Protein backbone atom coordinates (compact mmCIF):
# COMPACT_ATOMS: atom_id res chain seq x y z
CA UNK A 1 0.00 0.00 0.00
CA UNK A 2 1.49 3.31 -1.01
CA UNK A 3 0.49 6.45 0.82
CA UNK A 4 -0.12 9.76 -0.98
CA UNK A 5 1.00 12.38 1.53
CA UNK A 6 -1.46 15.20 2.09
CA UNK A 7 -0.39 18.44 0.36
CA UNK A 8 2.92 17.03 -0.89
CA UNK A 9 4.45 18.62 -3.97
CA UNK A 10 3.70 16.57 -7.06
CA UNK A 11 0.97 14.55 -5.35
CA UNK A 12 -2.80 14.62 -5.69
CA UNK A 13 -3.98 14.47 -2.07
CA UNK A 14 -4.95 17.77 -0.53
CA UNK A 15 -6.34 18.73 2.81
CA UNK A 16 -6.29 21.37 5.48
CA UNK A 17 -3.08 22.53 7.10
CA UNK A 18 -3.53 21.55 10.72
CA UNK A 19 -1.19 24.23 11.99
CA UNK A 20 -1.24 23.15 15.64
CA UNK A 21 -0.60 19.46 14.92
CA UNK A 22 1.38 19.01 11.72
CA UNK A 23 2.91 15.60 12.48
CA UNK A 24 -0.22 14.21 14.11
CA UNK A 25 -2.42 15.26 11.19
CA UNK A 26 -0.31 13.12 8.88
CA UNK A 27 -0.32 10.25 11.38
CA UNK A 28 -4.12 10.54 11.51
CA UNK A 29 -4.17 10.17 7.72
CA UNK A 30 -1.91 7.11 7.84
CA UNK A 31 -3.88 5.38 10.58
CA UNK A 32 -7.15 6.42 8.94
CA UNK A 33 -6.09 4.76 5.67
CA UNK A 34 -5.25 1.53 7.48
CA UNK A 35 -8.57 1.66 9.36
CA UNK A 36 -10.44 2.27 6.10
CA UNK A 37 -8.73 -0.77 4.57
CA UNK A 38 -9.52 -2.89 7.64
CA UNK A 39 -5.85 -3.41 8.50
CA UNK A 40 -5.18 -3.50 12.22
CA UNK A 41 -1.48 -4.41 12.33
CA UNK A 42 1.05 -3.65 9.63
CA UNK A 43 4.66 -3.42 8.54
CA UNK A 44 5.78 0.02 7.44
CA UNK A 45 8.59 1.41 5.32
CA UNK A 46 9.32 5.08 4.84
CA UNK A 47 11.95 7.09 3.01
CA UNK A 48 13.18 10.55 4.02
CA UNK A 49 10.37 12.26 5.96
CA UNK A 50 8.91 8.78 6.34
CA UNK A 51 11.42 8.31 9.18
CA UNK A 52 9.84 10.96 11.45
CA UNK A 53 6.39 9.73 10.37
CA UNK A 54 7.31 6.20 11.48
CA UNK A 55 8.57 7.45 14.84
CA UNK A 56 5.26 9.26 15.31
CA UNK A 57 3.33 6.09 14.38
CA UNK A 58 5.37 4.20 16.98
CA UNK A 59 4.51 6.86 19.55
CA UNK A 60 0.81 7.00 18.73
CA UNK A 61 0.02 3.37 17.82
CA UNK A 62 2.91 1.08 18.82
CA UNK A 63 0.63 -1.93 19.06
CA UNK A 64 -0.24 -1.63 15.36
CA UNK A 65 3.27 -1.43 13.88
CA UNK A 66 4.75 -4.94 13.69
CA UNK A 67 8.12 -3.78 12.29
CA UNK A 68 9.47 -0.75 10.45
CA UNK A 69 12.11 0.10 7.85
CA UNK A 70 13.47 3.65 7.96
CA UNK A 71 15.25 4.35 4.67
CA UNK A 72 17.36 7.48 4.33
CA UNK A 73 15.60 8.89 7.41
CA UNK A 74 15.34 12.63 7.89
CA UNK A 75 17.01 14.05 10.95
CA UNK A 76 18.48 17.25 12.29
CA UNK A 77 22.12 18.04 12.98
CA UNK A 78 23.45 20.98 15.00
CA UNK A 79 25.34 22.34 11.99
CA UNK A 80 22.21 22.30 9.83
CA UNK A 81 19.50 23.70 12.10
CA UNK A 82 16.72 25.31 10.11
CA UNK A 83 17.40 23.23 6.99
CA UNK A 84 13.93 21.68 6.79
CA UNK A 85 12.06 24.87 7.68
CA UNK A 86 14.04 26.93 5.15
CA UNK A 87 13.82 24.36 2.34
CA UNK A 88 10.07 24.00 2.82
CA UNK A 89 9.47 27.76 3.05
CA UNK A 90 11.42 28.25 -0.18
CA UNK A 91 9.98 25.33 -2.15
CA UNK A 92 6.98 23.49 -0.70
CA UNK A 93 5.09 26.50 0.71
CA UNK A 94 4.98 28.65 -2.47
CA UNK A 95 4.03 25.58 -4.51
CA UNK A 96 1.22 24.70 -2.09
CA UNK A 97 -0.11 28.28 -2.09
CA UNK A 98 -0.16 28.25 -5.90
CA UNK A 99 -2.09 24.95 -5.96
CA UNK A 100 -4.47 25.83 -3.12
CA UNK A 101 -5.57 29.47 -3.26
CA UNK A 102 -7.08 29.26 0.24
CA UNK A 103 -3.67 28.55 1.78
CA UNK A 104 -1.40 31.50 2.59
CA UNK A 105 2.34 31.78 3.15
CA UNK A 106 1.56 32.92 6.71
CA UNK A 107 -0.30 29.65 7.35
CA UNK A 108 2.56 27.67 5.83
CA UNK A 109 5.07 29.50 8.02
CA UNK A 110 3.11 28.67 11.19
CA UNK A 111 2.64 25.07 10.09
CA UNK A 112 6.35 24.62 9.37
CA UNK A 113 7.41 26.34 12.60
CA UNK A 114 5.33 23.83 14.51
CA UNK A 115 6.52 20.95 12.37
CA UNK A 116 10.22 21.76 12.58
CA UNK A 117 10.32 23.93 15.72
CA UNK A 118 11.84 20.99 17.57
CA UNK A 119 14.78 21.10 15.18
CA UNK A 120 16.58 18.27 16.93
CA UNK A 121 17.19 14.59 16.37
CA UNK A 122 14.23 13.03 14.45
CA UNK A 123 11.67 15.83 14.99
CA UNK A 124 8.77 13.74 16.30
CA UNK A 125 10.18 11.90 19.31
CA UNK A 126 12.96 12.23 21.85
CA UNK A 127 16.01 10.08 22.37
CA UNK A 128 14.45 8.82 25.60
CA UNK A 129 11.43 7.64 23.64
CA UNK A 130 13.58 5.82 21.07
CA UNK A 131 15.24 3.91 23.93
CA UNK A 132 11.84 2.47 24.88
CA UNK A 133 10.75 1.30 21.41
CA UNK A 134 10.49 -2.49 21.33
CA UNK A 135 9.32 -2.69 17.71
CA UNK A 136 11.88 -4.29 15.36
CA UNK A 137 13.49 -1.61 13.19
CA UNK A 138 15.76 -1.71 10.16
CA UNK A 139 17.59 1.53 9.38
CA UNK A 140 19.04 2.24 5.94
CA UNK A 141 21.35 5.23 6.51
CA UNK A 142 22.21 7.94 4.08
CA UNK A 143 24.59 10.87 4.51
CA UNK A 144 23.26 14.05 2.96
CA UNK A 145 22.24 17.17 4.90
CA UNK A 146 18.57 16.13 5.14
CA UNK A 147 19.38 12.46 5.93
CA UNK A 148 22.32 12.64 8.33
CA UNK A 149 24.26 9.44 8.91
CA UNK A 150 25.03 10.42 12.51
CA UNK A 151 21.34 10.73 13.43
CA UNK A 152 20.41 7.47 11.70
CA UNK A 153 23.17 5.64 13.54
CA UNK A 154 22.18 7.24 16.84
CA UNK A 155 18.68 5.80 16.45
CA UNK A 156 20.24 2.38 15.78
CA UNK A 157 22.35 2.67 18.92
CA UNK A 158 19.37 3.76 21.05
CA UNK A 159 16.55 1.51 19.82
CA UNK A 160 16.95 -1.90 21.49
CA UNK A 161 15.54 -3.97 18.58
CA UNK A 162 17.18 -2.19 15.68
CA UNK A 163 19.32 -3.39 12.81
CA UNK A 164 21.22 -1.46 10.17
CA UNK A 165 22.03 -2.11 6.54
CA UNK A 166 25.48 -1.71 5.07
CA UNK A 167 26.49 1.83 4.26
CA UNK A 168 26.59 3.10 1.66
CA UNK A 169 23.90 0.88 0.22
CA UNK A 170 23.00 2.93 -2.88
CA UNK A 171 26.49 3.17 -4.37
CA UNK A 172 28.00 1.40 -6.10
CA UNK A 173 24.74 0.34 -7.73
CA UNK A 174 25.67 -3.33 -7.28
CA UNK A 175 24.92 -2.90 -3.56
CA UNK A 176 21.26 -2.00 -4.07
CA UNK A 177 20.09 -5.61 -4.65
CA UNK A 178 21.88 -6.64 -1.45
CA UNK A 179 20.09 -3.92 0.51
CA UNK A 180 16.75 -4.90 -1.06
CA UNK A 181 17.38 -8.52 -0.10
CA UNK A 182 18.08 -7.45 3.50
CA UNK A 183 14.85 -5.42 3.61
CA UNK A 184 12.84 -8.35 2.25
CA UNK A 185 14.42 -10.74 4.76
CA UNK A 186 13.74 -8.33 7.62
CA UNK A 187 10.10 -7.82 6.65
CA UNK A 188 9.51 -11.55 6.11
CA UNK A 189 11.03 -12.33 9.50
CA UNK A 190 8.62 -9.96 11.23
CA UNK A 191 5.36 -10.44 9.35
Report residues per predicted region:
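Conserved acidic catalytic loop of the alpha/beta-hydrolase fold
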Residues: 24-42
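Catalytic active-site module of serine/aspartate enzymes centered on a nucleophile-bearing elbow/loop
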Residues: 162-191
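Conserved hydrolase catalytic core segment
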Residues: 40-76
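The alpha/beta-hydrolase serine catalytic core
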Residues: 73, 78-133
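Conserved alpha/beta-hydrolase
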Residues: 1-12
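Conserved alpha/beta-hydrolase "acid-adjacent" motif
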Residues: 145-151
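Short beta-strand/loop motif that positions the catalytic acidic residue
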Residues: 133, 139-141
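Catalytic nucleophile-loop/oxyanion-hole region of alpha/beta-hydrolase
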Residues: 12-27
Amino acid sequence: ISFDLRNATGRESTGPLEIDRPWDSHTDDQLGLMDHLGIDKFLVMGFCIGGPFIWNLLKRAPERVIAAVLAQPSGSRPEARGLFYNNNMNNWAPNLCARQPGVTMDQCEKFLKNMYGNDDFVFTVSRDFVKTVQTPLLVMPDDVPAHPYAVAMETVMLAPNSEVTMFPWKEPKERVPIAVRQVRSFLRAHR
